[in-house]
Amino acid sequence: MQPSLAPCLICLLVHAAFCAVEGQGWQAFRNDATEVIPGLGEYPEPPPENNQTMNRAENGGRPPHHPYDAKDVSEYSCRELHYTRFLTDGPCRSAKPVTELVCSGQCGPARLLPNAIGRVKWWRPNGPDFRCIPDRYRAQRVQLLCPGGAAPRSRKVRLVASCKCKRLTRFHNQSELKDFGPETARPQKGRKPRPGARGAKANQAELENAY
């Protein structure tokens, strides 16, 4: 009985395949040795990302591609506050309320104030202070109604139209540069000093030298 040649051929082919794989190395096997890719090389691993750029707590809530430089110029401006009130002049009162602009408080960052006006440049975060003060005024004529059947009157008022940020340095707050003492009386022209005052000064000098 002659053995079949098919199993022998299969064994020879498997043996030849294993010999070829051993010559190329075991790195050619992929997917748990179920697929042979002889031309596939090793890919380099990507470098690990820096977690500090992704941490928004360290970047002040800003995206990592928009770094904030403390030396950059940032805008400061006043907050726009409108105040509506009635004008009075004695017993008379305006027929309609008047809306005016109120400038008060410190200047804040313009990016945080959507309705900001009067923008200026702020060069240093720890630099001089800025205050919001009136910049321009507008004149408006208001009609006043008086009680008792009196004829209405008109009055011209001055209202704030815009505000601005004024720079206040440390020089404005130095109290030693200000003279809080009594103002010296200026000598008046055409008048002679009184003799009584001159005698009082002379007597005071004699009393001081007596001891």
From Swiss-Prot:
Transmembrane segments: none annotated. The keyword Phosphoprotein does not apply. Disruption phenotype: Mice were resistant to mechanical unloading-induced bone loss. Residues 1-23 form the signal peptide. Disulfide bonds join 78-132, 92-146, 103-163, 107-165. Residues 80-170 form the CTCK domain. Glycans are attached at residues 51, 173. It holds the Pfam family Sclerostin. GO terms for molecular function: DNA-binding transcription factor binding; heparin binding; molecular function inhibitor activity. It is found in: Secreted, Extracellular space, Extracellular matrix. Its main location: secreted. It comes from the Eukaryota. This is Sclerostin.
